[in-house]
């Protein structure tokens, strides 16, 4: 019985795959053999040199062959499987079911090679293909190569900044990214695009693929696809041109199968070969591509990303490749698609692309930074770019001769691609033929001039003209049109180039939305649980609200709170992390972005409804609202409509903004509008005319009206204790002498009709209810439609490629613009070419002084096991080895072999069951181990606002001992900058990808951050050359070699080393899948020791021209589809080398265990290199500097506070002295408090990036104490909040026109602009450090804020709270902030009631109003507006503002008591923040959400079975 299994660890490349027999060996299936043969591989290759060479020659010949010209050798390779395909094909109607093939089956070779193309041709199904011509193509972008980064200082000097911006914009210049590029790729050809990072390779691919929106200066020249102009191609046939970017962006919580199935489903043609069903087509296409790229074992594993555990980095890259291929483009542009792949898998990728071009006639442009000779030989043509200029285009076998005639000679054992790329490196090694020293071109301009004057260039232009004459453009269009119509769904629009209809796209996106929700359970569970908890608490707060007039305000408060809670929850929808994925799928033409916008809305709706239903049922019946079915379902209906409308509104805002800071600012203003203009806080009659219109454009106003109408229509509210006058002495008076002191009352009537109350207080009419329903539908559909429209038309921000942004005052121009034509010309390139490579020799020697380490790191029988699928899975299997000072050890293996897992385990970064010994000098590692070792991760994660130099200086200060002089640390940093050749951009900000350092520069910074720490034990490097070109990789390895020679111990994983690069290493640790050792020992001169071991143990002989690194990976069966019969792990266990290694490990342990060692860190090991105070100083400086330069964040915060202050001030402008004015003053203070919600969202969005950096990299190196991350985040926010809250104070306080005395104003400022800011900064961070991610933090924050708001005494007076909950009123800090702010505003303020606020009644005959009510007034307060009248007495409930304060349980006398309580709350927030982070992130306590989804999982499984 066969089984397949897999496991992956976040950030690692560990996986298990394969089909296991009862003896544990890999059983090769015909599917494996088929895929291997199609990729040009065979297990017969192991028989010797001839087979290997023959295999390569077959591939080389097939490179230029058509489908009908496949060689007999290729056919012979598959002849042994002769019968099975016919059986399986006949069963499935021509569709090959790879999952059902078994090894004993045989199939017909001709059918498998020609089945798809031949059957399609026989059935009249057209397959599209087209060549590409580029003529004199140039691309220009904004000249941002040396920009200065803006800071908050620019805001402080705003007038000058505005003037400078206008000046720069008027005189803005463009820079040339691509200059006069030409090329020709016929259908079925592969073109390799070579160049260093920044040379324009990615830009050329984007231009070729029609992705030209980002080029601000536009694209010139002619690009045609078999004669079809690019503009027409993009309009009519966009799906056929695919650009696959370098970054692997996927929905991290989807599994591999879900990811591939979705892409295939979006591209499933309507007319399919042999009329197979849609489900069969999806399954077979997925299985085929997953088999080719070795992904079948990962079907049920999440794709993951840098922060979500999933498949390994190499497997994620393969998912990206497979996803692009299933989109069925005819022209592909692959941007560095082999990044992160091991050498064997990279070669298999190239061969797979070769097969698709041969059999399907597709055209491929590919950039590869480190291409082996085998990969190079799979291509037809190659072009070389040098800083945007083309210096060669032609056949691959003529490129080397072209540059040889130019005067350059390829050094021995240097692969062709490396030779070609090296020519464009001014610092690289160039072997010049004798006599050509002064003739060869050296600068980009000279190379370009030589190329354009060459016969090869003239022949290229002739070939392009000839090709354009040969092709029949109209016939190509006809075939394209017919093919697309065959593929297109019958319900799709006629002019649409999408395969499936818009409604099918929505269905697929909805299904994917459900899968994403199920994959990311934490957020959904937190949302539903928050709703249930909040409803229980709030429902009990309003428990059995009185049905009399005393409960009317509370009933409105319950309904308002329901609306406000779900409005706050809408802020959690401001997500930007998925935007790159939507952009990629738009490029692939999988679906309309609008379909995703609608699909995600539909998918989220049921889960929101679950939470909302639970929420409303609980709060509705606990609070004692109208218990009739009609009222309940009307409230339910309008709450649902409003919630969905507000969610759609916030999603609309996110869709229209470029970043989350902008979205948070705008959403904060919208949130204030929702809170203010619902008509609960300020009613329509009291609204100022300049803002009244806002209430009419928000759905909450109509929802609130209809919900109030459902509650109060027809309700008779008894007066209860609100009769005036009443009490002692008024027991026996007639009813006509009393009145309800409530809006809507009538003289002599002891109750108030709910409809009268709503009409007078709110101007609400029952006839509006269903009108409002129609209006809300318009809002909901309008917001959704606008969101879909903006999502559809939103384009990426225009720019000019990678742009360096320098720290203000330090920028350096390395390029100059020609004033006349704007072209770029490099300065002093010749001088740099000839002299610069030797200028850093001295500094390189200086860096290695006193570097020698005496520590030997040993690991013995290391095993690593983790829980998996209800059991345990072993990822490392008794791995042993050692690293000695002065040695450079390579750690190799295919993707999923356990390289990163081993590094993480040895570096003490894994959590799980770890057994075995890890020793330093024979002794167990101590607490200083992490900081005494360096670890360069695969992910290049840095603080974007710091410069390169500042990042290195911070690492040096934190990682080196405090007793090392500051000058020495900084000198060492400067040496590292020189050695890594980072001087030109040392003062450049790290920035983000595309606007900051490029991939190469980021990788160098990652290495530099560890080198400046001067680790005295060991340096771990995980793929340090990934994403770099061959020259940069060589420079990095040479640096490591020098470090090793100086005494450093280095263990380094490496994926695609060239032969020369590989032989720079001293020792090799080779792993196979399962974390099993295959070899550990010396490599030897020219790899002789290593090759001898493999050849002696059954591997074929390695030819002299082969790359040993590729040879050994092939020998052990590495690769996505490869397999071998030998068990190389068992061979290693039985070898003499293994016995020798074990003996040496034991000898080292015995020898070193009794020796005493010394280090820079002193005798007593410590976890951190520096003191807490020293760490605090520099972490605070770094955090403050980062915030100072984050202008988007600061401006968003300033806009929120400034606009918010003006908004509140002029909404409640001069509220007056009436009773309504008192309420509006209370709400003005209350809404000022609510403004903290979006402000805290802003804080959390920024702080999460610092948390992720610390947890992924800095904490693992014990760089500084974890508490400093929290404290410095808190402290760095304070100055900006103080400043912006001062602006808020001025713009909101004085328009209220209450107290202008300096004393009152100053105390108000102290309460809000100082104390409240200190409070909510800490509160927002406290919630963030509790949550697993930002979205969950937003939900938890909304829950907590709703608690604080509900219990502060505004929406529910404390007098009406159940006795149990009065402690929460006393506990809520918002209670005391509101008390003080309202107390200052209303203290000693006289009250003059308006006419409608007066309670009118008649006194008994013969008495004046004053005489009749005197006893009542003495006890209850208030005043009679007409004391001497004998009829129509006018009673006002309050005489001064302090009476109102007493009613809401506040008092001016509480002022300084509350001030003391503020400090207690602020201190509690800080302590809670530290404690929560310790519990959830240091101790690692986490919650499991799977059980909550158990029922949903069962339903899903049943659904699958039924299908």
UniProtKB/Swiss-Prot annotation:
Give the originating organism.
Candida glabrata (strain ATCC 2001 / BCRC 20586 / JCM 3761 / NBRC 0622 / NRRL Y-65 / CBS 138)
Which GO MF terms are attached to this record? ABC-type xenobiotic transporter activity; ATP binding; ATP hydrolysis activity
The gene designation is SNQ2
Q: Does the keyword Transport apply?
A: yes
Glycosylation site residues: 55, 336, 626, 659, 878, 1311, 1428
Residues binding ATP: 893-900
Q: What is this protein called?
A: ABC multidrug transporter SNQ2
Q: What does this protein do?
A: ABC multidrug transporter involved in the response to azoles such as fluconazole, itraconazole, ketoconazole and voriconazole and contributes to the development of PDR1-dependent azole resistance. Plays a role in biofilm tolerance to fluconazole. Also confers resistance to 4-nitroquinoline-N-oxide (4-NQO).
Q: Please name the InterPro entries in this protein's record.
A: AAA+_ATPase (IPR003593), ABC2_TM (IPR013525), ABC_trans_N (IPR029481), ABC_transporter-like_ATP-bd (IPR003439), ABC_transporter-like_CS (IPR017871), ABCG_dom (IPR043926), ABCG_PDR_1 (IPR034001), ABCG_PDR_2 (IPR034003)
